[in-house]
Regions:
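Pyridoxal 5′-phosphate
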Residues: 1-363
Length: 363
């Protein structure tokens, strides 16, 4: 199988990730629940994961909360920052993991910047939304549909100028693009563990600068006499037993990412450029621009879902449809058709793109 669906989850992971998960399952008990060796090893595995995340995201280990996925982290962050009925600025390319929690809170959502790959439009409309009275902002770093890299540093600066706290959704950028919590000044950054960080599914991170409200309540292994959750992070947001094997695997994935420097970003970007150029030669409508990560979408001449299935029958794994982001499709004008999405990973190589283009051309 030629796997080109890294926007959904990483599939080919570094061997160290598999080894770390198995080692944790065989040697670690529950952290914070005992002073014996296996419990201590579990605590060490979890703390090591936080330390590695701190190195990658420019934050302290205690600012790193382990979650089950990026959606989990976004729900905590949004419910911590956004008041029911509050006015919130978002980009025109947000995922349902952002939009549905906002809708559930009855937030007044102001959509700012609907032009693909157009930083001027994004910043102009985002500035207007902030000045119109937004009291919070939530925006993605990279569109999960189109790979559009938003000007998040400039958007963060606008938020700071207006005194508006903000949340960054790093679902499609963590592990590939630089993401720095304290330098950016976000209240929260949410990231999945299983995508660009190359960890197991069922893992994620919430990086915290702001005051966080618990989403779940229960045991933490500390301050058990209290009727409410502890005040200190990360315990305040981690009720119940931590996913120790997941944390160990995520730690190994992040260590691999750190060891690669900018290689992964460069490899993905090379294939996106090649893919866009080759699709254009085939006369296929592809969405490609100046500010693009390792994802590209195109609209075939037939139903997207059927086209993706035909690619699957040829051993090529891609994603088709609305990708849980109808707002992004509405902005790009593809809400009725959806798109076929190709997303590369750390193993991005010419032969993958060549095989994809050959299959598309034959179809």
């Amino acid at each position: 199988m030629i796997y080109l669906d890294y926007g959904a989850t990483s599939f080919h992971k570094p061997p160290a990730v598999y080894r770390a998960v198995e080692r944790a399952m065989r040697t670690c008990a529950s952290p914070g629940r005992g002073g014996y060796g296996a419990a201590q090893r579990g605590a060490e595995a979890v703390f090591s994961c936080r330390e590695t995340a701190g190195k990658l995201f420019d934050c302290r280990p205690e600012q790193v909360v382990l979650t089950t996925n990026c959606t989990h982290g976004l729900n905590i962050a949004i419910r911590s920052l956004v008041k029911p009925g509050g006015r919130v600025a978002v980009s025109g390319f947000e995922h349902n993991a952002v939009m549905r929690p906002l809708y559930a809170l009855g937030a007044e959502v102001q959509v700012a910047g609907r032009h693909l790959f157009d930083w001027d439009n994004t910043l102009e409309e985002f500035r207007r939304a902030l000045r119109a009275g937004a009291n919070a902002a939530v925006f993605t770093h990279v569109s999960n549909v189109f790979g559009y890299i938003l000007p998040v540093e400039e958007m963060a600066a606008l938020c700071r100028e207006q005194g508006v706290p903000f949340i960054l959704d790093a679902a499609q950028s963590a592990g590939t693009l630089p993401v720095k919590l304290n330098a950016l000044g976000a209240e929260f950054i949410a990231a999945p563990g299983h995508k660009g960080l190359l960890g197991p599914q069922g893992t994620g991170l919430l990086l915290c600068r702001g005051e966080a409200a618990p989403l779940l309540f229960g045991g933490t292994g500390s301050e058990s006499i209290r009727k409410d959750m502890p005040d200190m992070l990360p315990e305040r947001l981690e009720a119940g037993t931590v996913n120790v094997p997941g944390a160990a695997g995520l730690d190994a994935g992040m260590r691999y990412v750190l060891s690669q420097g900018s290689r992964i970003e460069a490899a993905e970007h090379r294939q996106i450029r090649r893919c866009a150029r080759m699709l254009e030669k085939l006369g296929v409508q592809a969405f490609y621009g100046a500010h693009q990560a390792g994802t590209i979408s195109f609209v075939p001449r037939e139903d997207c879902e059927a086209f993706a299935q035909r690619l699957a029958d040829r051993g090529i794994a891609v994603r088709a449809g609305l990708h849980c982001a109808p707002l992004a499709h509405e902005s790009a004008g593809t809400l009725e058709t959806g798109t076929v999405r190709v997303s590369f990973g750390p193993d991005a190589a010419d032969w993958q793109t060549d095989a994809l283009i050959k299959a598309v051309g034959n179809m």
